[in-house]
Amino acid sequence: MKDRKDIDKKYTWNLDVIYSNTTEFDKDYDLVIDKINSLKKYENTMMDNSDNFYDSIRLSFEIERLIDKLYCYVNLSFDLDTSNNNKQELCEKISNLRSKYSENSYFIVPSILKNDYGVIEKYMKENPLIKDYEISIKEIYRYKEHTLSDTEEKLLSSIGKMVGNSYDTYELFKDCDMSFDSIEDENGKKVELNNSNYSLYIESKDRRVRKDTFNTLYKEYKKYTNTFASLISSNMKELSTLAKINKYNSAIEMSLYADDVDIKVYNNLIDSVHKHIDYIYDYYKLKKDILNLNDIHLYDIYVPIGNSFDKKYSYEEAKDVILKVLEVFEDEYITKVKEALDNRWIDVYPTKNKRTGGYSGGSYDTYPYILLNYQDKYNDMSTLIHEMGHSMHSYYSRNYNDYQNSEYRIFVAEVASTVNELLLSHYLLEHSSDVEEKKYILNNLMELYRATIYRQTMFAEFERDISSIIDNDGALTADKLSNMYYDLNKFYFGNGVVVDDEIRYEWERIPHFYYDFYVYKYATGLSAATAIVKGILDKKENAVKNYIDFLKCGSRLSPIESLKVAGVDLTNSSVADTALDEFKNILDMYKSMI
């Protein structure tokens, strides 16, 4: 692996445009300290008059903006050299600064909520500049009916350290205390199975290896079913109790409230998948036939179908491809993509001690940088266009909004990146003359829809059902959890797949069940992206304009309302229906090529 000094600068991040020297960095750091001290002076006088109110709100966002910039710089720097202790210390320094700000700004929300919104309206008339922060203030008031008295909030805060430990215990136990028997790989070599290499061996072309991997893993999980049942039950009880304390009807309602999402969006997704369950049954039948199996078991599901595809795309070739793919968008979009590619927004190649993987990251006052570890594979090109989607979303969101309205929610975070991925796949399917490449892309797409919509929706249904039991004062025993999970697998895989008994323990190894109703967002994100791409490719009137307007929304609108700007209404089940119909179309295209 190369050292950074051996990489052409044009393939590396330019972080000097953030801070060119330590003096500039220290100046902003000291400025944050000064502003925190200024903010603290308003602790007891914030709501006394419109000027104090304005100064407090303005200062708080100025501090957050500066901390974001500092935090971005130190974290990007650290990710380029994770062995650098000085950079690690800088990360901790800024993390401590963020904590200091939190400690000294805690009074803002309680101070605001002690007053009726009429007071805010009065202050806005006296000082029109306060209207710049109206959306953020209204978001605070949205939680008023779920906010407790000062005494109750302090009491709840004091026990906060005891809440959320279930996940920490779960991770430690699963990753540190569990050990698995060895299996023999394809060459007869003994290898110790673990949670990390399980995915490697469950995709083996050798069915014996897959079966041994599956049975060995779940044999170990079976031993600890009662422990995992206790952990997930504790987590659900914590959520349910917090929901009741904060005046929500259920744990799921509390979790969805953060994104201003109605529970019917969650339930519509599950209903749509149920309506189109036959599509995934057809996919498993196709896989069974291609693998030439008399019967297909759960340990056969993850083996790739078709021949391996190893076409190389150099980074320069990938740049050319994605520019052609993204020509469907307006001039500003393409101009900014070219700037990203040519102006050192992207750190391209793997180097010694560089963070692995890929991401898009930045702040309001920096480029929306992209980290890659490019190695000339198709997946690397796909990662580039995926992360470019994130970065362009960030560009539009920040460029068309003031800081306080510029951060889009996690609920919509994967939409823009997935739109780009889907556009790449459709472009290559249209322009490639290589049948194997087309089959490879179609297989990737089928797996994307299987894993992101069908599998994540099964998880979402399980999570909804077990939380309902706790909300209604029921008990989650090991047997009940395992039986519920097994029955869901029977439905989601159908009669055409042998649903091995061991799968009843799979829920024990899914960390997302501790993420508080998060997984459905993967499915809604892909559903929304599919609808957007369909509109663009079908040249639907204003499809591109509406999509760009969605990218510009930031946090001015709720996630559901911002997607409506793009022409996608997730309160309507037709969005998920369309995505699942697209899965069926992809399946049929693949069948036509074999």
Spans of features found by a protein language model:
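A well-structured
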Residues: M1-S308, K319
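C-terminal, non-catalytic "cap/extension" segments appended to globular domains
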Residues: D6-I7, S20, I112, S136-R142, ...
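Long, K/E/R/D-enriched contiguous segments that form extended
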Residues: I290-V325, I334, Y369, H393, ...
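Catalytic zinc-binding patch centered on the HExxH motif and its immediate surroundings
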Residues: K311-Y313, I346-T366
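Short pre-active-site segment immediately N-terminal to the catalytic Zn-binding motif
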Residues: Y313, S363-I385
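Conserved helix-loop functional segments at active or binding sites
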Residues: K324, V328-T335, G358-G361, H390, ...
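Post-HExxH zinc-binding segment in Zn-dependent metallohydrolases
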Residues: Y408-E437, L445-E447, A451, G525
